[in-house]
A protein has these predicted regions:
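Amphipathic alpha-helical assembly/interaction segments
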Residues: 1-117
Length: 117
């Protein structure tokens, strides 16, 4: 078992949290605590789920929840862009990172569900 901070998925998820923190900081006050707070909370939970999956024998449930929370974060990011709370370029950067985390999590989950060879 590798240290979770050395995993490629962790590094990308941390970058996502960093980007989201900057996005939320610049949101209008009315939306900062509602939409912005929820996006930040989901991203923190994604990082925590990576840690849990790395430590657990049965990784699939944690990875399934991670993928679900990633979808919620993407939905809230899209809403933020549609409401013009963030720019299209900021949205594109965040979605690039969520896509990378999603691909890695899906591959890790597939690997965890496959019978040991």
């Amino acid at each position: 078992m590798a240290l979770h901070t050395n995993l490629p998925i962790y590094k990308v998820a941390y970058d996502l949290l960093d980007v989201v923190t900057d996005l939320v900081k610049n949101m209008p006050r009315d939306f900062k605590s509602s939409i912005g707070g929820k996006i930040s909370q989901e991203c923190v939970e994604i990082v925590v789920l990576i840690f849990r999956a790395n430590c657990a024998r049965d990784k699939a449930p944690h990875l399934g929840e991670l993928i679900e929370r990633l979808q919620v974060a993407e939905l809230l990011l899209r809403l933020s862009r549609d409401k013009r709370l963030i720019s299209t370029s900021q949205y594109a950067r965040a979605i690039e990172l969520t896509g990378s985390v999603g691909k890695q999590a899906s591959g890790w989950r597939r690997s965890a569900l496959s019978p040991a060879s």
